[in-house]
Swiss-Prot record:
GO-annotated molecular function: protein-L-isoaspartate (D-aspartate) O-methyltransferase activity
Positions of the catalytic residues: S94
Keywords on record: Cytoplasm, Methyltransferase, S-adenosyl-L-methionine, Transferase
Matches recorded under InterPro entries: PCMT, SAM-dependent_MTases_sf
Species for this entry: Anaeromyxobacter sp. (strain Fw109-5)
Ranges of Basic and acidic residues composition bias in the record: 23-42
Name of the featured protein: Protein-L-isoaspartate O-methyltransferase 2
Family: Belongs to the methyltransferase superfamily. L-isoaspartyl/D-aspartyl protein methyltransferase family.
Gene3D superfamilies associated with the record: Vaccinia Virus protein VP39 (3.40.50.150)
Gene Ontology biological-process annotations: methylation; protein modification process; protein repair
EC number annotated for this UniProt entry: 2.1.1.77
GO cellular component: cytoplasm
Subcellular location: Cytoplasm
Amino acid sequence: MLARSLLPALALLLAATAGGDACADRGHPSAERSTPETERRRMVEEQLAARGIRDRRVLEAMGKVPRERFVPEQWRSLAYLDEPLPIGRGQTISQPYVVAFMAQALALRGGERVLEVGSGSGYAAAVLAHLAGAVYGIELEPELHARSVETLAELGYGNVHLRRGDGFLGWPERAPFRAIVVSCAMEEIPAPLWEQLVQGGRIVYPKGPEGEVQLLVVVTKTARGPREEHLAPVRFVPMRRGG
């Protein structure tokens, strides 16, 4: 059911994750982009709702999070284009469409405990904070971790908890989780992450090797074992192990 509902957007998702230029909104005069709020509203309407994001709660969450606060100052004027933007240490903040697409795939209803692996700038964690009860994020890069902690604190996200560490290991002290989202590519689910997922829970991640087109998949933990659904072709950087 979930995969079928997302089919109209699949062709757009690969283009977005591969570079985003083809999906950027450049059709409005600069005079209309007067405030981040108006740009955010247009992003939700034209980049998300018009392209297949149907979960009302996801659309509302995307409309509340100030993406410009999660990117370096020199990129803030581009914050609401549907493109990845550099955040330092060779990493990027994902396009709004990709963040919304993955959040929708988690099928959150409110109150859940969610783990994000590769929390980066903290933007996706902020979106998830509007959809779940508590969000736990793991980031390997010390600089990105420190900056995201500061940004989320300034914005008042008290239900987001971040740590620096190896995403392969998850966060056993805060497990179990109803949902896990991984923002970097893996060829298989690490055993610790699977063990930290509750029965009936979902993990969304890009499946495949580095340098190739990967598949965004959602895997549900059932009594009979994992049930995997293929959602869309994507390109993500690979997950790295901690030193």
